[in-house]
Design a protein with these regions (language model features):
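Catalytic cores of the polymerase beta-like nucleotidyltransferase superfamily
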Residues: 1-195
Length: 195
C-alpha cells in the first residue's frame, strides 16, 4: 500500500505523496517539517539508519542542501550508529560527500566531525592539522567556489588525508589535482607565517 511504501522512506520530508483523489498524502508530518526546516526520520530513527547506514550521511547532506537542522532523536541516532557506515561501499559514501561539499551550505560538514562520522568513513583519520583549524576549514569551504577539486582539497586539508581520496575510489586525475592544490595551499600557509 501507499502508506507502507511511505513508512519505509528515510525522512519525513521524503515520505509524502500526491493522490488525484485526496491530494497530498502526508502521514508523517513532512509538510510540517519542511515548513520548520527540520530533517527527521520516519518512525524510529535507529531503525531507519539500521536499514541503510547511508541514510546517516544523507541526513547531513540534506541538512546542507536545504539549510535545515537535524531533529534531536535523529541526530542522536546517527551519532550512535555512525560505526555502521564502515559497511557502506566507498563509492556510495563518496557520492553523498560530494553532494554535501557542493551544496550551498558546505559548512554543515561540521556535523561529520561532531557526530563521529569522520573517523568511521576515513578509517580513524580525525587529525585536524596544526596549520588549519576546523573552523578555518569551514569558513574557507563557505567562501570557496563550487568547484569539485577546490572543495575537496579544502575539506581534506583539515585532515591527515594520506590515501583518503584513493580509499573513496576517486579517479587518478582528481587525486592528482587535489594533492597539488593541497600542496600549494600548505606552501602558501608556510610562506604567510614566515612573512
Amino acid at each position: 500500500s501507499l502508506e507502507e511504501d511511505l513508512k519505509r522512506r528515510d525522512f519525513t520530508i521524503n515520505a509524502m505523496a500526491y493522490s488525484d483523489r485526496t491530494g497530498i498524502v502526508d502521514k508523517f508530518h513532512g509538510v510540517e517539517d519542511l515548513q520548520s526546516h527540520i530533517i527527521r526520520c520516519v518512525g524510529v530513527a535507529k531503525e531507519r539508519f539500521t536499514e541503510d547506514a547511508l541514510r546517516i550521511l544523507r541526513a547531513v547532506r540534506f541538512s546542507a542542501a536545504l539549510d535545515f537542522s537535524i531533529e534531536e532523536e535523529t541526530l542522536q541516532a546517527l551519532t550512535e550508529l555512525a560505526p555502521n557506515l564502515r559497511k557502506i561501499s566507498r563509492e556510495r559514501i563518496q557520492t553523498e560527500l560530494e553532494k554535501l561539499l557542493m551544496s550551498d551550505h558546505p559548512e554543515r560538514a561540521e556535523l561529520l566531525f561532531f557526530t563521529g562520522i569522520i573517523p568511521e568513513i576515513f578509517d580513524g583519520c580525525l587529525q585536524v592539522t596544526a596549520q588549519e583549524s576546523l573552523a578555518d576549514m569551514l569558513v574557507q569551504l563557505c567562501r570557496s567556489p563550487k568547484q569539485h577539486y577546490v572543495r575537496w582539497s579544502l575539506f581534506l586539508g583539515g585532515l591527515a588525508y594520506e590515501g583518503v581520496l584513493k580509499s573513496l575510489k576517486f579517479d587518478n586525475k582528481t587525486i592528482r589535482i587535489c594533492e597539488k592544490y593541497h600542496a600549494y595551499r600548505q606552501e602558501k600557509l608556510r610562506a604567510d607565517k614566515s612573512a
